[in-house]
Amino acid sequence: MTSTACGINRRLGLSALALSVAIGLAGCSGEDFTEGGELTRLASVPSGAEITGIYLSEGGDLFFNAQHPSDANAAPFDRASVGVLVGVDVNDLPTSFKPSPVPRTAEERQQVLTALGEYQVIAQEGDTLDGAVPAGLGMTISRDGSRVVKASNDPDFNGFVPTREDGSAGFLFTNWEDRPGGMSRLEITKGGDGRWQVLDAMMLDFGDVDGT
């Protein structure tokens, strides 16, 4: 595998399982996939949850979601989360680092654990975000706006569209995978401390096609 292909593989080929179990730091070095580096666990999600929406930006920000966690978890991870790994440039990871621990205690099993940086929750299912999303994030409402027809805890695909050249601001789109499903759009900006802030939010109107 060429170095170019390896780079593309690392940027776009990360699966949910790969992140929850491990990220390969040198796994592309072998010519026939029989040689390569070890795998190192970067993050794990709370009990009942699935990692979805893995998106690595050009600036090294790794967005991912904790989909459908157990509602028995302690807050905040009793609700589905759209979030990002802060405090680390994933495009410039060290050659080796201590892996994220395997969750063993009851407390650890109810958290997002990371090897590097910290998982920041940007928004969660049901958040109204200062009234910008009156029915709540992830909620699909009827065409006349009178009722919620589906309350989703399944944030899936993420896509980040930067509005600044350095990638420190933009729109984060998240598909809420359900029947019917929906899509949220969060306008976000990164502060000097590396943490993200929501400036505006909305659920996109897919009423004409009966949801996503």
Language-model region placement:
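N-terminal secretory signal peptides that target proteins for export/translocation
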Residues: 1-9
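Sequence/structural signature of beta-propeller domains
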Residues: 30-212
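Sec-dependent N-terminal signal peptides
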Residues: 10-20
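C-terminal motif of bacterial Sec signal peptides marking the signal peptidase cleavage site
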Residues: 24-27
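Exposed regions on extracellular, virion, or secretory-pathway luminal proteins
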Residues: 13, 29-30
